[in-house]
Amino acid sequence: MTKALETVGLAKSFGALQVTRDVHLSLEAGARHALIGPNGAGKTTLVNLMSGALAPDQGQVLLSGADVTGLSQARRVKQGLARTYQINQLFRDLTVLENVVISVSERLGASWNLWRRASARAEVIDEAVVIRGQLQLDDH
């Protein structure tokens, strides 16, 4: 079975400080995982390496079996690999669906484009409705 996300031999140093070394990680689709450890253990660095915010010194990041190591963070987002930060907030004045539409729009590269075609808007809304249903979120 293809893993949703894998790292193979991932390593990153900042000067003489080796933050990650030979990290092998396999994450199954739909499973929940926790990355825990003390401050300074390299958790954020590992997430930044996987998301493309940092380039590894060695190793690979695989998304559904495809090597995305050389892709920018923006390209990884378009392929479905994105990260959230510890402090994340929804737009409180928007509905659940409207919040999901913003996220889907960003991933599809359709955000904040007033001149995009109507069918692209419909595609974004349709996908957002599906995601909202999968997550069993009610609108308010």
Mark where each language-model region is.
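Conserved ABC ATPase "signature" region
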Residues: 112-140
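Short beta-strand immediately N-terminal to the Walker A/P-loop
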Residues: 33-34, 83
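Helix-to-loop junction immediately C-terminal to a conserved catalytic motif
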Residues: 51
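ABC ATPase NBD Q-loop/coupling interface
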Residues: 60-79, 115-121
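Short coil-to-beta microelement around the adenine-binding A-loop and adjacent beta1/P-loop entry
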Residues: 17-18, 75
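Short coil-to-helix segment of the ABC ATPase nucleotide-binding domain corresponding to the Q-loop/switch region
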Residues: 94-110
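The feature captures the beta-strand-to-loop junction immediately N-terminal to the Walker
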Residues: 36-38
